[in-house]
Amino acid sequence: MSDLPIFDSNAPPSDRREELAMAGFRVDPTHEGPQFYTLLAVGGDNERPLVADGRIVFFVRTTLVHKALAMDPSLAVLGNPPRGVETICDVAQTLYLVNSQDEDPDGVVLDCLLIFDDLVRATGISMPGRYQGILTELAARLTEGDSLKKIFTNESLRDHVEDALLWCVGAITMKARLLTS
C-alpha cells in the first residue's frame, strides 16, 4: 500500500510535530477490547509503526510499552509513550461489517484501513495491485461519507474487500514480532 493515495505525497512537508500514539488491535470477535498493541509515529509526513530489525513490534500488555519503544530508536526520540490507547484497529469488527452490514456509524472500517496502510508500508511487502486499488477506493468512499450499503452494490465486492483485508493481515503477521514479557 505504499502508493495508497489517502494523502497527497506531493504536498509540501507539514510543520506538524510527530508524536507517539498507541494503537490497540482486536482480531478475535469473542474477545472484549484490544488483544495486543503497537506504537505509531503520527502527525508528520511519515506515519509509521514501531519497527525493530525489519519487524513491526507488537506487545500484549500496555505495561510493555517502554520495552517495545526502546527497540526502535527512531520512535524513541519522539518522547515518552502515551499512557493509554488512542485508536483501535478492530479487525474482527471490520471483517464483520464488510461481510454483512450496510452501515458503519463509528468509522471502524476506515480506522482499520488507515492503520493497515501504515503497517503494510512498514512491512516492505508490495501489495498486489488489485488489492491496493480496491482498498484505496474503499477508503476514499468512506472518507467521503458513503455508507457500506452504497459501496457494496454486490456480494462479490464484499468478498474482494475481505480478501484484500486478509492479505494485509497475512503480510503484517509475517513481518511482526510479538512481545509477551
Language-model-derived ranges and their functions:
Residues 2-78:
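Short N-terminal edge-element motif at the start of the domain
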Residues 3, 18-19, 32, 47, ...:
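Glutamate identity and glutamate-enriched acidic tracts
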Residues 65, 69, 88-94, 134-139, ...:
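Generic structural signal of hydrophobic/aromatic residues within well-ordered alpha-helices
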Residues 72-94:
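Short amphipathic alpha-helical linker/capping segments at the junctions of internal repeats
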Residues 92-106, 110-111, 145:
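Basic Lys/Arg-rich amphipathic helical interaction modules
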Residues 107-181:
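A eukaryote-biased signal for long
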